[in-house]
Amino acid sequence: MLNSPGTRRPVKEAQKYGEDSQKSHSPGTPGPRSSVTTLSASALSDSSSPDTPPRRGPGRPSTPARAPATSAPMMYSRRGVRRTARPAGADTRSSANQLPQPSGACANADSAPPADVSACLRRRSHGDRCVPRSRRRPRPRPRASTAFFQEEGPCGACPGALRPQAGASFRELRGLPPPRPREREQSPPLGAAPSSALSHQGWKNTRCATRGLVNTLVNTGHFLYLQPPAPLIMPYLDDAEVPGNRRSHPSLSFSWLSKALYHVTFLLRIL
């Protein structure tokens, strides 16, 4: 239907597909479309007169390798063995890859028979899109992961994360536990030592040796799922260390003293 003999295709499309009308017609007679689509105006006037033989026959004079822009867009290759019609701007070095193709081996109902085997394979893999046009390289096929790189992930920087509308988070798809709720950054109490300006988690890991040891054991992965989702607040003697009471007891914040007392009692309990 699309390529029926009555259908006229413009010259650009005829160049794009590199169609060969000699496979379905005798070598002396031009195909039904070839006089319309592939010949220039001068060649049309030659072939339309009754006494002049058509220029596409076997006795046609050889065309130079670089055809001028006014000549017919289709050319024969230099060797007389293969008479394959090719676009004028196509690369002549690729003719070594072309094999003689049996008619109808790869011809679809909606596309003209291809000029060579590699174009046939390209056309079968994804559409007519990659068949080389004249003077232009084929479009590169898109990468497989392009769909996931379009938007940033939930964290804003992960390139491979799924879109947030997808329903499942990126970590759940890989079997990871869901991320914990972030700790609130705790403001230091008014009279406190500068060490407590760190967040509770950072203080716990740096200042306390025993608790840091427990943390390293826990974070190696054995007890990963047994940790509570939010860190527990250690029962200091100082009320100002509890986040709810921070603002209400600014005068009681002897935090370094209370921490020292707590660790002394903690170590005594262990021993």
Curated annotation (Swiss-Prot):
Highest rank taxon of the organism: Eukaryota
Transmembrane segments: none
Residue stretches of biased makeup (Polar residues): 92-101
Biased composition (Basic residues): 121-142
Biased composition (Low complexity): 33-50, 59-73
Spans annotated as Disordered: 1-202
Ranges annotated as biased composition (Basic and acidic residues): 10-23
Protein name: Putative uncharacterized protein encoded by LINC00271
Organism: Homo sapiens
Gene: AHI1-DT
